[in-house]
C-alpha cells in the first residue's frame, strides 16, 4: 500500500472539476487536458527541508509527547504518545496517520525518551508501520511498551549528522541509573541557521546538572532557538537557570487540552516569558485554524463550547505550509533562514 501526503486544499476541487470536464458530451474541446487537473491530488507537493535545515512537527497526542524531526533525507521520531491496555493507542490513532499525511515513507530512527506510557506507549504501533532501524532509549529502561525491542542507549555524547544537521544526546550521562523521568533522553538538534532542544520529562535537578555540564563543554551547550518545555510544563521542571541558559526564542509545551494535572503550569510559562519578554508559543497543544504566518486564533477559540470557558484562551501561531494538514500537529521549521517558524495546527 502506497500512502500519499495530504494534498493542498485546492487539489480536490480541481480533481472534481477535471472529472466533470471528462463527463461533458463527446466533442467538447480539450477533454484530454482534464486529466491534468488530477495531478495536484495524485502528486502532492512534498515540502522537505533543504540540506542544513531541519523541521520539527509536534503531533497532538493528548497528554503525552510525540515529535517528528525531519531533515532533507532522514526522519526521526522522538516519543510516540500514550497507549493504554485495551484502549486508546496514540501511536496507531494519531502518530501513524500524521506521518502518512506528512508524506513520511520511512523512519530512520526512533527515540523513547523514557519508559512511561505517555511517551513510549504508542511506539509499538508506530514501529509496526515504520520499522525504524535505529531505536534509542535510556540505559536499563523499564516499561511494558519497550519490552522485546532491541534498543541503543541515548548516552550523553552520542551524536551523528544527517544532511548537514547535527543530532546529539546531552542526557543521561554514562552510568546514570534509570530514574524514569530524570533519565529521559535529551536531544539537541543543530542546523546551519538555528537549533532545538528536546527535553523529555527531566526535572529541575537534571536541568541544573545540564547547565553545569554546558559550562564545562561547548559541545553540550544549551543555547537553542526552540526548546520543548520539560515534563509538559509541570511545576517540577524549567529551573530558572536552565531557562536562562537556553536563551530560547520559542518554548513548546506538549500537554493534553484540559488535562487534570494543570499542565502547563502558569508559573512555568511565566519563567519562559520573563527572559525573552515574550509569550511562549504553545499555551496548550491542540487544534488551530488555518491562517497566515502571523499570530492567529486557534480552532478551539473559534469554536468554543459553552461548557469549555477556557477555550477562548487557546491561541496558536502558524506558517502556511502546515495549515493544509488535517491532523492535529504543530510544525516548527528550525533553520529555514534566520527565523524559526512555527505552526499550531488542527
Question: What are the language-model segments listed below?
Answer:
Residues 1-57, 70, 250, 270-281, ...:
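Transmembrane helix-bundle segments that form internal channels/tunnels in multi-pass membrane proteins
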Residues 59, 63, 91-100, 113, ...:
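Active-site-proximal loop/helix segments of hydrolase catalytic cores
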Residues 14, 120-121, 125-212, 273-283, ...:
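Flexible, acidic/histidine-containing loops and adjacent segments that form or flank the divalent-metal
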Residues 339-345:
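Short, intrinsically disordered C-terminal tails of secreted or membrane-associated proteins
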Residues 50-169:
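Soluble catalytic regions of membrane-associated enzymes that act on cell-envelope
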Residues 81-83, 140-141, 156, 174, ...:
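Short, acidic/turn-prone active-site loops that include or flank metal/cofactor-
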Amino acid at each position: 500500500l502506497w500512502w500519499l501526503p495530504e494534498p493542498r486544499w485546492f487539489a480536490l476541487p480541481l480533481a472534481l472539476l477535471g472529472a466533470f470536464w471528462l463527463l461533458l458530451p463527446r466533442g467538447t474541446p480539450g477533454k484530454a487536458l482534464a486529466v491534468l487537473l488530477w495531478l495536484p491530488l495524485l502528486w502532492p507537493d512534498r515540502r522537505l527541508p533543504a540540506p542544513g535545515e531541519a523541521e520539527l512537527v509536534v503531533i497532538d497526542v493528548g497528554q503525552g509527547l510525540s515529535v517528528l524531526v525531519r531533515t532533507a533525507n532522514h526522519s526521526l521520531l522522538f516519543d510516540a504518545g500514550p497507549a493504554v491496555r485495551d484502549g486508546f493507542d496514540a501511536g496507531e490513532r494519531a502518530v501513524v496517520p500524521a506521518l502518512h499525511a506528512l508524506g513520511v515513507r520511512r523512519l530512520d530512527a526512533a527515540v523513547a525518551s523514557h519508559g512511561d506510557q505517555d511517551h513510549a506507549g504508542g511506539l509499538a504501533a508506530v514501529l509496526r508501520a515504520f520499522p525504524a532501524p535505529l531505536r534509542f532509549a535510556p540505559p536499563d529502561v523499564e516499561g511494558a511498551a519497550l519490552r522485546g525491542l532491541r534498543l541503543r542507549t541515548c548516552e550523553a555524547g552520542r551524536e551523528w549528522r544527517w544532511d548537514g544537521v547535527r543530532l546529539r544526546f546531552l542526557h543521561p550521562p554514562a552510568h546514570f541509573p534509570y530514574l524514569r523521568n530524570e533519565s529521559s533522553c535529551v536531544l539537541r538538534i543543530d542546523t546551519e541557521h538555528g537549533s532545538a532542544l528536546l527535553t523529555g520529562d527531566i526535572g529541575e535537578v537534571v536541568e541544573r546538572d545540564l547547565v553545569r555540564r554546558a559550562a564545562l563543554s561547548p559541545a553540550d551547550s544549551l543555547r537553542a532557538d526552540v526548546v520543548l518545555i520539560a515534563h509538559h510544563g509541570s511545576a517540577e521542571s524549567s529551573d530558572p537557570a536552565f531557562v536562562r541558559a537556553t536563551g530560547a526564542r520559542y518554548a513548546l509545551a506538549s500537554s493534553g487540552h484540559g488535562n487534570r494535572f494543570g499542565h502547563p503550569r502558569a508559573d512555568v510559562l511565566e519563567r519562559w516569558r520573563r527572559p525573552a519578554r515574550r509569550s511562549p508559543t504553545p499555551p496548550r497543544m491542540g487544534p488551530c485554524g488555518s491562517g497566515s504566518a502571523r499570530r492567529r486564533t486557534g480552532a478551539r477559540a473559534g469554536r468554543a463550547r459553552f461548557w469549555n470557558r477556557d477555550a477562548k484562551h487557546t491561541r496558536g501561531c502558524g506558517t502556511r505550509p502546515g495549515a493544509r494538514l488535517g491532523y492535529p500537529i504543530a510544525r516548527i521549521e528550525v533553520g529555514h533562514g534566520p527565523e524559526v517558524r512555527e505552526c499550531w495546527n488542527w
